[in-house]
């Protein structure tokens, strides 16, 4: 009799995706982040569900309801901090996952890469709306500043902003709709993840060498299931250390002050994972220009498959490209630091230089270096 996992319509899908899936034998720990992102999404949906049971999306009671969760609900403080810091872990895994894709040339799987970029945008939108929900000072002013950016769109800008706000300022209507969107988007993300995996399994995984690995495949289970469990345990360990020892390390103290439209915080800044984009936004002294640069900083990921001029797929055997890649990483860390600094000398000029370098490396230097490497190898 054939095994049920190979015949049952539902089990068959699971079997082909997680058990009998042929996987390259040499994929490194950098390939763990896909499963870790799945784990992060699961943690966020579960903790978010329990938070939603006690949260009220009304301007009068939102802040109090979060306080109530932390003080009165059984382990409410734990659920809330796992959710808040889980978002940080989510973005750490996201950035490492994208970085892996760039380094090893995984972006040559067009559909998988493009769905991944859509996922990145949707996760960023979800995180932004989630940050507004506690209705602290930084929630309110962050929502005001970021939604206001849409007013830079010519002709329809102001109408669009007021339509999103549901009034003439960020108020009850805004909070209610942000809660609704924040609740629904993770399920849309889950659907997109399935599409992402569907396209990935059409081609199979890439591997560190960037070479075709059809001649050397091993079953996903037990080899990579065990490897993924190790990654999951380490992720949970780091998350719980963060949650139990310094839950507010990555947060902003201003968000412990209830939202007050009459008093602006001295430094309005988003959560750490948006700081690089925020720095690029601020480095251009024009509203529309800044917004375009902000969107371009993520959309530029779409250009990687088009600008891949090297004869090799992976950067594993391309030392010059490796150097430029790590300079790009350092540049992004610099932008993240600048995004959290006040708008004054010398931070303004550092931010502008880092922003220029970011776009220059991706659009000019990396393709040029690829061509030089081709020449050096007489290809």
Swiss-Prot record:
One GO CC annotation:
mitochondrial inner membrane
Note on how the cofactor is bound: Binds 2 heme b groups non-covalently.
Ranges annotated as spanning the membrane: 33-53, 77-98, 113-133, 178-198, 226-246, 288-308, 320-340, 347-367
Q: How does it sit in the membrane?
A: Multi-pass membrane protein
Determine the domain of life of the protein's source.
Eukaryota
Q: What's one Pfam family the UniProt record gives for this protein?
A: Cytochrom_B_C
Q: Which GO terms describe its biological process?
A: mitochondrial electron transport, ubiquinol to cytochrome c
> What are the alphabetically sorted keywords of the record?
Electron transport, Heme, Iron, Membrane, Metal-binding, Mitochondrion, Mitochondrion inner membrane, Respiratory chain, Transmembrane, Transmembrane helix, Transport, Ubiquinone
Q: Where along this sequence does the record place binding of heme b b562? A: 83, 182
UniProt GO molecular function: metal ion binding; ubiquinol-cytochrome-c reductase activity
List residues binding a ubiquinone: 201
Location(s) in or outside the cell? Mitochondrion inner membrane
Q: Does the keyword Transport apply?
A: yes
Instruction: Quote the CDD domains the UniProt record gives.
Output: cytochrome_b_C, Cytochrome_b_N
- Name-wise, this protein is Cytochrome b
Q: What is the source species?
A: Otospermophilus beecheyi (California ground squirrel)
Q: Which gene encodes it?
A: MT-CYB
